[in-house]
């Protein structure tokens, strides 16, 4: 408790339990501090449950790992105490615990002194990640009579910010120092603490050492899965069967049996907590699935179903049913006639209601209790009609392993959400169930031993899951709290998880069991049979160990990654076929990648490269790809001799990965011992050549050349003709490819290279083409225009707006295209008319269609795509129309419901004139739907809110007045023949809607019904039954009411005659809706939540 909370502290003098509080240690001591007597731990050697011998012996040798202890702290010269004092540490769960005592004053009585008494944990630790939950009793010893000692309880999660907890005003100072009270003797006061701590988190807790078992890492909101997996793991017979499943040919990332084998194997052999990500990945879960908190019963059921199906046809087929399947019979027995219905069913778990039940026996009694079917709930006995009957279930067999689901999470209709029931519910360690079996076996009584208690702390919206397990069935319990496993007492495992309110603060109200696992006593040794390494197939062991070896290798590589760099080698054959700027496309090129030590020398790398590529060192030359200031990337000179001793990271200028163009001798000449020509870095230059063909609008790579810088352009023409396969002396046009969107023509062929090319450097590119007049007829007659077109070229994904998650198709377009050019290109791909397409921008903030484009849009494609990031896929949406876009743009989209002649609703979208009226909308609807054969052919538009018709719109009403809203729906229907002409004096169309008990809970399809003044209501009922096509037996359950202003009055069906005034608004209240006829009956249609994604059933996909 902080200092503000201390202001609300209760009077210690009244000895009421004040709120526990935390307090920071107050620094400093008095000049003459009170002397402290260190008392030994009273019960340091507390009894601890057994486990594996090694763990037990270790714990006996070192009591610091114990779970509880009582220790005392005596303060001498107590009356002179002026500062806080600390006791020596007592180690529990290997954490230091100290008693802290100090003088305090009551906040509301500043002149009245009190004793502050706190328990401190691990205060001197520098770590900020540790935590430990503990319960403690703080006591001041009465030396005359221990029964009069004053004590208070605390329960707290200790962590670095709240490392002490207790009471600022534990007792009044005057009471402690009053010799008559018995708390002080010779100016000495003894303080005592009994602390009981859970295993800590965030510290070096060795679960394997202390218990013999390891935990599971918490993967997020699937933490309940850890409890289930531990429960299944300790069902040893199941574990054995899982090991025996053949998985040799299974995909390691998709096989559920293999993933389960892996988890079980690691739980059995690992010394550290085991991960479950590979298991959930094998389920085929998406991110949302993995973090949705499902019922543990649901996960248990689908997981065991999946494993059971994979076991079919193997040596362990039938293991799941053998362990978990029981049989029951559901029966219905008629009372008055000789009719009985029996249905035998298999079950794999039992769901027990706990609301209002004291213990598990009462829940079983309730489960098999006989239900009376009478009154409105009579049983339909076929030819015998509706009959009074008794309904119930009886257990035929109970399985060896009994899973009991305690229904702590239930739906609350008042709040329309699930709630958690934290009521106390008791369950025994031994559970006799013979009395619930239809037939018992004296040789094999249905006596069960508690094996697992799955516990939830928190409310319906979240919390924490743990499981208490009795691994060997011998009453020695362990607590599995995700990655931490610790010994615990039988009381902690059982009684502390009953739930309900308790004065004992060690039991938290919201912590209780939600699932129990019992094992039949006669099957205990079989179900919990020892699982040894001999039970695990050798091939499985080898596969899992190989996985571990590979993971360790990858982990080592990650740890050493900072020592290495990647060198990407690109060969000259990757330049061939490239149709863009520079020498290759970085996203398409295939590199040969080398992992190189950053501190290795260039000479060492060249030697390794030579051996790997199969070329002697004099047949290769390295040209690092260097980024130029103009945005291009070209090869640059690397001097092997001068730079041979330099390190790779130094030469790469910390570039990682480092890309190098590897020049080699022609493979055909390499065998003859040919070497690369000499290259004088001071006087020579390396140039790349490309040939452009206007007829095919393509580039052809023509290799590279070494030439002196003083060489004239004209001297290169013969080489170009030769490389391109042209006749010598063919007239050529030359360009320098400077950068994207800048290609300059070389005009003067009689000047040297350094004057002809802009800033001559190694890696410059010359593009040449034939000087042919016929090229003028080409779409892109020159290389300059080709590169300009290339610069504006863009790949656009077009997705159909009407198809959810449509992957679409890619079209290569020019940024300079206008709307019609784009539409024409896309229409050719879709084999349709450009005028029958409508396009939509992509929303910038999320992936989806935005506003539609008008057909007279004046911008270019570049304008449409300007908000996309450079490397982001460019996307536009389209929809195909049934009318030309010029006509379509003058219409509006109108979503509504169509009620067909079979009284079924379907959603349709109509496109009436945006300035039209309801009549135009109805005419459009006639074109889109199929009308009934024996109907009027006339349509009407209804407005529906909350499943009630609130109005019929007139045909001359403008559509502009009908604005859509989420709370209302428009419905179009054909007017029945009997409703075309209404005698307004004696007839009326009344709204009919469905509800169940509460008139605000309407549902189903409302409709209009014609009623006549004075007609008997039975006639109205006949028309309703005919319209809804309901069987007589079902229709008998309907009640009818007139609903006005939210209140309903039930109709006496035998006496009531229709009075039209009952369905007219009250005088003076014309603004209120008309009364309507309500049909009160049960809603058999499933209610759908607005949050349907949260109700998605859990599913294992593989």
From Swiss-Prot:
Gene Ontology molecular functions: cysteine-type deubiquitinase activity; cysteine-type endopeptidase activity; deubiquitinase activity; K48-linked deubiquitinase activity; p53 binding
Gene3D superfamilies found in the cross-reference section: Apoptosis, Tumor Necrosis Factor Receptor Associated Protein 2, Chain A (2.60.210.10), Cysteine proteinases (3.90.70.10), Phosphatidylinositol 3-kinase Catalytic Subunit, Chain A, domain 1 (3.10.20.90)
Residue stretches making up the MATH domain: 68-195
Residues the record lists as Phosphoserine modifications: 18, 49, 963
EC number(s) on file: 3.4.19.12
Pfam families in alphabetical order: MATH_2, UCH, USP7_C2, USP7_ICP0_bdg
Region feature (Interaction with TSPYL5): 1-208
pH-activity profile: Active from pH 7.0 to 9.5.
Organs and tissues of expression: Expressed in neural progenitor cells (at protein level). Widely expressed. Overexpressed in prostate cancer.
Annotated crosslink Glycyl lysine isopeptide (Lys-Gly) (interchain with G-Cter in SUMO2) location: 869, 882
Residue segments, region Interaction with p53/TP53, MDM2 and EBNA1: 53-208
Major place of residence: nucleus
Modification after translation (UniProt): Isoform 1: Phosphorylated. Isoform 1 is phosphorylated at positions Ser-18 and Ser-963. Isoform 2: Not phosphorylated.
Catalytic reaction equation(s): Thiol-dependent hydrolysis of ester, thioester, amide, peptide and isopeptide bonds formed by the C-terminal Gly of ubiquitin (a 76-residue protein attached to proteins as an intracellular targeting signal)
Active site: residue positions: 223 (nucleophile), 464 (proton acceptor)
Localization terms from the record: Nucleus; Cytoplasm; Nucleus, PML body; Chromosome
Keyword Transcription: no
Annotated positions of the N6-acetyllysine modification: 869, 1084, 1096
Family: Belongs to the peptidase C19 family.
Domain notes: The C-terminus plays a role in its oligomerization.
UniProt-recorded name of the protein: Ubiquitin carboxyl-terminal hydrolase 7
Native source organism of the sequence: Homo sapiens
Lineage: Eukaryota, Metazoa, Chordata, Craniata, Vertebrata
Gene name per UniProt: USP7
């Amino acid at each position: 408790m902080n200092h503000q909370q201390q202001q609300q502290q209760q009077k210690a003098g009244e000895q009421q339990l004040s709120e526990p509080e935390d307090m920071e240690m107050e620094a400093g001591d008095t000049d003459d501090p009170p002397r402290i007597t260190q008392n030994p731990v009273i019960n340091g050697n507390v009894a601890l449950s057994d486990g594996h011998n090694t763990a037990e012996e270790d714990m006996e040798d070192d009591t610091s790992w114990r779970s509880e202890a009582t220790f005392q702290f005596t303060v001498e010269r107590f009356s002179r105490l002026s500062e806080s004092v600390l006791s020596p540490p007592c180690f529990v769960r290997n954490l230091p615990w100290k008693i802290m005592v100090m003088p305090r004053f009551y906040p509301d009585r500043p002149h009245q002194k009190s004793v502050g008494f706190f328990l401190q944990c691990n205060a001197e630790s520098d770590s900020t990640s540790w935590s430990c939950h503990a319960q403690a009793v703080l006591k001041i010893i009465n030396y005359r009579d221990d029964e009069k000692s004053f004590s208070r309880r605390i329960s707290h999660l200790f962590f670095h910010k709240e490392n002490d907890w207790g009471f600022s005003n534990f007792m009044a100072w005057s009471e402690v120092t009053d010799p008559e009270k018995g708390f002080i003797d010779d100016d000495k006061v003894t303080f005592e603490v009994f602390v009981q701590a859970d295993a800590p988190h965030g510290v070096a807790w060795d679960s394997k050492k202390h218990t013999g078992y390891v935990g599971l890492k918490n993967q997020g909101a699937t933490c309940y899965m850890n409890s289930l997996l531990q429960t299944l793991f300790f069902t040893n017979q199941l574990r054995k069967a899982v090991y025996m499943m053949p998985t040799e040919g299974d995909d390691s990332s998709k096989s559920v049996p293999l993933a389960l084998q892996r988890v079980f194997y690691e739980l059995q052999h690992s010394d550290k907590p085991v991960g479950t990500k590979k298991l959930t990945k094998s389920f085929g879960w998406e991110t949302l699935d993995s973090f949705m908190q499902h019922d543990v019963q649901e996960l248990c059921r689908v997981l065991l179903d999946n494993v059971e199906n994979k076991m079919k046809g193997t040596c362990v087929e039938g293991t799941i049913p053998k362990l978990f399947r029981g049989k029951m019979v559901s029966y219905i027995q008629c009372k008055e006639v000789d009719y009985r219905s029996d249905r035998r069913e298999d079950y794999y778990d039992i769901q027990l209601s706990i609301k209002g039940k004291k213990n598990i026996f009462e829940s079983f009694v309730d489960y098999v209790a006989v239900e009376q079917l009478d009154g409105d709930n009579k049983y339909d006995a076929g030819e015998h009609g509706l009959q009074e009957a008794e309904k119930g279930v009886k257990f035929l067999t109970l399985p060896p392993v009994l899973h009991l689901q305690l229904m702590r999470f239930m739906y609350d209709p008042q709040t329309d959400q699930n709630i958690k029931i934290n009521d106390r519910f008791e369950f025994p360690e031994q559970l006799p169930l013979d009395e619930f079996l239809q037939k018992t076996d004296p040789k094999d009584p249905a006596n069960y031993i508690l094996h697992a208690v799955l516990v939830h702390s928190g409310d319906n919206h979240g919390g924490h899951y743990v499981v208490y397990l009795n691994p060997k069935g011998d009453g020695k319990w362990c607590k599995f709290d995700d990655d931490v496993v610790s010994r615990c007492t039988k009381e902690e495992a059982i009684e502390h998880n009953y739930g309900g309110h308790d004065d004992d603060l060690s039991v938290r109200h919201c912590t209780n069991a939600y699932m129990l696992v019992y094992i039949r006593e006669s099957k205990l040794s079989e179900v919990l049979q020892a699982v040894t390494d001999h039970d695990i197939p050798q091939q499985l062991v080898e596969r899992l160990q190989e996985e571990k070896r590979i993971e360790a290798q990858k982990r080592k590589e990650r740890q050493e990654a900072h020592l290495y760099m990647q060198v990407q080698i690109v060969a000259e054959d990757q330049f061939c076929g490239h149709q863009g700027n520079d020498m290759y496309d970085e996203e398409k090129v295939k590199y040969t990648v080398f992992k190189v030590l950053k501190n290795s020398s260039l000479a060492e790398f060249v030697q390794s490269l030579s051996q790997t590529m199969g070329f002697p060192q004099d047949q290769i030359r390295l040209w690092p790809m260097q980024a130029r200031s103009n945005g291009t990337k070209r090869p640059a000179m690397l001097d092997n001799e001068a730079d041979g001793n330099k390190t790779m990271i130094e030469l790469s200028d910390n570039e990682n990965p480092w890309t190098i163009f590897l020049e080699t001798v022609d493979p055909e000449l390499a065998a003859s011992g040919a070497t690369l020509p000499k290259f004088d870095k001071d006087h020579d230059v390396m140039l790349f050549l490309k040939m452009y063909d206007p007829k095919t609008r393509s580039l052809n790579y023509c290799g590279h050349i070494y030439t002196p810088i003083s060489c004239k352009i004209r001297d290169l023409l013969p080489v170009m003709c030769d490389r391109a396969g042209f006749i010598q002396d063919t007239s050529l046009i030359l360009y320098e490819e400077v950068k994207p969107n800048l290609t300059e023509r070389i005009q003067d062929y009689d000047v040297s290279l350094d004057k002809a090319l802009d800033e001559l450097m190694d890696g410059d590119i010359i593009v040449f083409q034939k000087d042919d007049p016929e090229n003028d007829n080409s779409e892109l007659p020159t290389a300059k225009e080709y590169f300009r077109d290339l610069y504006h070229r863009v790949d656009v994904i077009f997705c159909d707006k009407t198809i959810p998650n449509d992957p679409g198709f890619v079209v290569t377009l020019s940024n300079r295209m206008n709307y019609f050019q784009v539409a024409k290109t896309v229409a050719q791909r879709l084999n349709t008319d450009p005028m029958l397409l409508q396009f939509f921008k992509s929303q910038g903030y999320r992936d989806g269609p935005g506003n539609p484009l008008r057909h007279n849009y004046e911008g270019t494609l570049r304008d449409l795509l300007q908000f996309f990031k450079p490397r982001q896929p460019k996307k536009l949406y389209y929809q195909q129309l049934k009318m030309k876009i010029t006509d379509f743009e003058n219409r509006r989209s109108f979503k509504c419901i169509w009620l067909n002649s079979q009284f079924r609703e379907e959603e349709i979208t109509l496109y009436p004139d945006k300035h039209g009226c309801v009549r135009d909308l109805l005419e459009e609807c006639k074109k889109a739907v199929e009308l009934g054969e024996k109907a009027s052919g006339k349509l009407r538009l209804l407005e529906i809110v909350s499943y009630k018709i609130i109005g019929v719109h007139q045909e001359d009403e403008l559509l502009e007045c009908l604005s859509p809203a989420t709370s209302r729906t428009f419905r179009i229907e054909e007017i029945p023949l009997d409703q075309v002409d209404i005698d307004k004096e004696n007839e009326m169309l009344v709204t009919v809607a469905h509800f169940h008990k509460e008139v605000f809970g309407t549902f189903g399809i409302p409709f209009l019904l014609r009623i006549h003044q004075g007609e008997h209501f039975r006639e109205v009922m006949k028309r309703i039954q005919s319209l809804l096509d309901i069987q007589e037996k079902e229709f008998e359950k309907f009640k009818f009411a007139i609903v006005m202003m939210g209140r309903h009055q039930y109709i006496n069906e035998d006496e009531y005659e229709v009075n039209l005034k009952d369905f007219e608004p009250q005088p003076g209240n014309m603004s209120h809706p008309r009364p309507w006829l309500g049909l009160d009956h049960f809603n058999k249609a499933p209610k759908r939540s607005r949050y349907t994604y949260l109700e998605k059933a859990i599913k294992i996909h593989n």
